[in-house]
């Protein structure tokens, strides 16, 4: 019981420290569905470990209805997890989440097999997963990993890496000195934008080259029916 109370206090304090929108403790207690989902899960997980599987599932089912967050009672969750906004989050049975992680709305930690074995992701400590991202399979995301919004991750990610895109690609690796919980989506590298920028630059260079060739060979252009402006 003392351990439960300690975790409850930590959960509340975590939100106070990491969400600038949290005005006071009463608001946190009453208005944070992600917090409620974690509390329901702690109870359901304890019952699940004691073999009360159906009761645990009923609590999990009620929690999903009440909070919009679905956490299987078999999932193992570390300390100070913050589920921000929460709606649509799904955490599968064999998922494991380390300490001090941050999960935004719409995140799915899903499985890729019907076999009754480890089939869901394992998250290290201080992992951040952006909204509407999907992490599939029995893969491991190392400590300090950041997953950009809307990404689909199906391969293991080394500690400190940043992953974006579909499928997820590693675009940056942080050193331990630079590792932080800040997650400015606008500052994340975007490989698709970089690719488009490169294509546009190449197109511009080709246009300039064609114009130079046209100016050097006006007679050839007229023979081909090309008009020079």
Language-model segments: residues:
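A structural signal for small-residue-enriched, beta-sheet-centric alpha/beta enzyme cores
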Residues: 169-181
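Structural signal for interior beta-strand "rungs" in well-ordered beta-sheet cores
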Residues: 64-171
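Proline-rich intrinsically disordered, low-complexity coils
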Residues: 20, 73, 121, 156-159, ...
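Terminal amphipathic alpha-helical/low-complexity segments used for targeting or macromolecular assembly
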Residues: 1-63, 178-229
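Solvent-exposed, flexible loop/coil residues
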Residues: 34, 39-42, 75, 81, ...
């Amino acid at each position: 019981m003392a351990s439960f109370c300690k975790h409850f206090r930590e959960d509340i304090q975590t939100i106070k420290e990491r969400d600038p929108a949290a005005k006071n403790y009463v608001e946190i207690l009453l208005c944070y569905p992600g917090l409620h989902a974690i509390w329901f899960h702690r109870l359901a997980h304890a019952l699940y470990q004691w073999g009360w599987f159906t009761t645990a599932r009923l609590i999990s089912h009620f929690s999903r209805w009440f909070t919009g967050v679905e956490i299987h009672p078999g999932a193992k969750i570390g300390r100070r997890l913050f589920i921000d906004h929460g709606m649509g989050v799904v955490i599968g049975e064999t998922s494991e989440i380390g300490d001090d992680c941050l999960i935004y709305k719409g995140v799915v930690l899903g499985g890729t097999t019907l076999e009754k074995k480890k089939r869901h992701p394992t998250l290290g400590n201080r992992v951040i997963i952006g909204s509407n991202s999907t992490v599939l399979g029995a893969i491991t995301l190392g400590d300090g990993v950041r997953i950009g919004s809307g990404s689909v991750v199906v391969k293991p990610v080394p500690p400190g890496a940043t992953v974006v895109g579909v499928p997820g690609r590693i675009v940056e690796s942080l050193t331990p000195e630079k590792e932080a919980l800040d997650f400015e989506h606008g500052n994340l590298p975007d490989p698709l934008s970089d690719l488009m920028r490169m294509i546009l630059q190449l197109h511009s260079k080709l246009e300039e080259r064609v114009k130079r060739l046209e100016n050097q060979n006006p007679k050839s252009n007229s023979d081909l029916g090309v008009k020079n402006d």
